[in-house]
């Protein structure tokens, strides 16, 4: 096991990894920007190193500064968290070339899965079903593009090969709009991701977003930890996640889970990963694989009893997975609400000082947050300041616990989206379960403030 790990991230995930290190008896080095200097988790760190000013490119995306911090503190490994450099293959490569262990997959795995075209090809090869579409990057010839769209069938969606986080995609309903949409997506992709390549997929009208959590070690062992339903989204950004997915037969989940685990063995994957699917009419279609820990990992931890972050660290240290597929049992139901510092209905970010922070408690309630009374939420980063996660024996009990937890939560000084969550937890369609990925946006349009 490592003696010391550097955590190359901020906020709630930095604190989450710090806690995992403490449990494993590993020293944690935190890096921070000038905007995060006063954060409590920085003050609680074994060691902390300032890596630059508030702007992300000069701090949390600054590879030389992060690697230098690992060198001066004698860390042995670097955990990237999620976001920032977590899915940057060049960073993973530089970390390992500098003599540190990257707590995540190899740079090659990240490269394959980070490019949506090569990821899709790898998944198809491993027998994982994918959304019908162009089997690779779209050509430049407009005639060929139109031919591909015709064979796939409208509506289609144009996606950036290097995209992610819900950016770099465009839905096209008619041939007349096709070529312009491809050109615009290419231009955007080149600017945003440094890669203008785009591909085409059939646009599913009313799918659900279901993902399979994978853990794999360096000894060709890979398991799946059930599924999560992340269909409650706004602008392709997840708002509420739950596990297991309501109303999907276990046999279907087992079949797709086994295929995902087999695919990971085939490509010598290591660490935590998530295969994301669109699910419609009883069919799963793989859309991408995330090569990092997910924001919503706690719902899976709750239903399986497996600590995903600790396991990430253990397999990076060369240990075998301490469990087999047979050991993994799904128990009860878990729901997570992301708490964002923003207007709950207009979604305008609300940075500033939290004058009062009171987190909920009680049986089956977990709060993952770096916030506290008098904490200043900087305007420089993502608006998420925490997550409320609940677990119950049944989905109904989990919903009841979440309603109570949201009512108990008190945040003053800034706006948060907690009022939105309170309303969604009593919404009849959400309570019934199985809403599709468009439901939240339709709900918001019908409940305009």
Where are the language model's segments positioned?
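Conserved beta3 strand of the protein kinase N-lobe
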Residues: 133-134
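ATP-binding N-terminal substructure of ATP-dependent carboxylate-amine bond-forming enzymes
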Residues: 1-126, 138-147, 397
């Amino acid at each position: 096991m490592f003696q010391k790990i550097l955590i190359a991230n901020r906020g709630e995930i930095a604190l989450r990894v710090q806690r995992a290190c403490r449990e494993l008896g590993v020293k944690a080095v935190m890096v921070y920007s000038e905007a995060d200097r006063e954060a409590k988790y920085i003050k609680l760190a074994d060691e902390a190193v300032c890596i630059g000013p508030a702007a992300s490119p000069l701090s949390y995306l600054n590879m030389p500064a992060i690697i230098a911090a690992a060198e001066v503190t004698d860390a042995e490994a670097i955990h990237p968290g999620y976001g920032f450099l977590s899915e940057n293959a060049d960073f993973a490569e530089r970390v390992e070339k500098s003599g540190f262990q990257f707590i995540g997959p190899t740079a090659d795995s990240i490269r394959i899965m980070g490019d949506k075209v090569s990821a899709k090809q790898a998944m198809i090869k491993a027998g994982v079903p994918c959304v019908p579409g162009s089997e690779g990057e779209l050509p430049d010839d407009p005639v060929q593009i139109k031919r591909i769209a015709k064979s796939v069938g409208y509506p289609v969606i144009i996606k950036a090969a290097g995209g992610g986080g819900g950016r770099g995609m465009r839905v096209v309903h008619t041939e007349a709009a096709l070529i312009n949409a491809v050109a615009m997506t290419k231009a955007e992709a080149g600017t945003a991701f440094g890669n203008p390549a785009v591909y085409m997929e059939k646009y599913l009208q009313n799918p659900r977003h279901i993902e399979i959590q994978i853990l794999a070690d360096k000894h060709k062992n890979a398991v799946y930890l059930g599924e999560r339903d992340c269909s409650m989204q706004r602008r392709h950004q997840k708002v509420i996640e739950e596990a297991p997915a309501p109303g999907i037969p276990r046999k279907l989940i087992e079949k797709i889970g086994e295929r995902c685990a087999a695919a990971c063995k085939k490509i010598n994957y290591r660490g935590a990963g998530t295969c994301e699917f669109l699910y419609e009419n009883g069919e799963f279609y793989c859309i991408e694989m995330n090569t990092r820990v997910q924001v919503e990992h706690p719902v899976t931890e709750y239903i399986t009893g497996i600590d995903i972050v600790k396991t990430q660290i253990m397999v990076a240290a060369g240990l075998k997975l301490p469990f087999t597929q047979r050991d993994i049992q799904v128990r009860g139901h878990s729901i997570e609400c992301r708490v964002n510092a923003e207007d709950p209905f207009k979604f305008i970010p609300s940075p500033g000082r939290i004058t009062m922070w009171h987190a909920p408690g009680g049986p089956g309630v977990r709060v993952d947050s770096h916030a506290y009374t008098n904490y200043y939420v900087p305007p420089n980063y993502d608006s998420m300041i925490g997550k409320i996660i609940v677990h119950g024996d049944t989905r109904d009990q989990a919903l009841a616990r979440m309603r109570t937890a949201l009512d108990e939560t008190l945040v003053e000084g800034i706006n948060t989206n907690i009022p939105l969550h309170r309303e969604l937890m009593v919404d009849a369609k959400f309570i019934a379960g199985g809403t599709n990925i468009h439901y939240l946006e339709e709900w918001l349009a019908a409940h305009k403030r």
